[in-house]
Amino acid sequence: MNWIKKGNIYNVSGNFSWAKSYASVPIIDQIDTSSYRIYFTSRNSLNQSSMGFFEIDINEPYKILNETTEPILEPGKLGTFDESGVMGVSLVTNNTKKYLYYVGWNQPKTVPFRWSVGLAISENDGRTFEKISDGPILERNTLDPYFVSSPFVIYDENLWKMYYISGLN
């Protein structure tokens, strides 16, 4: 496979209150033979992260075909694992649903942040997502005492498999 460097194809404009800075942690989802939806994480003026997407034709990647004006996934309620932000990291399509695995974070007093893994599901081809719970599906535990982050999920031979980063010392 030969890669062709295209450079920067998207910047947040700052026109949306939820997307003032950054278009980071991209997740690519192929819509048809040449159309792609690219999910990304952005920050608001309070440094909280939310998710949106834009769509391109791979043959004209600098031309934005569609862009969300509202976030598709937002920080959680006060006190939840994702109250400071959400960052999508893995997307799996299974039948008619899309499963978005994301890192939720909050800011405790003794360390800069605390990460856990959440799940949101779309039943409208990835245009919107709904969290399955206010709580994480994976968080610190006796084997992963410091943090869990960045899940990569696949559905293989009727099994869901997750690979993730663990903070060990």
Pin down the residues of each PLM region.
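Beta-rich carbohydrate-recognition and catalytic domains
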Residues: M1-S84, V92-S150, I154-N169
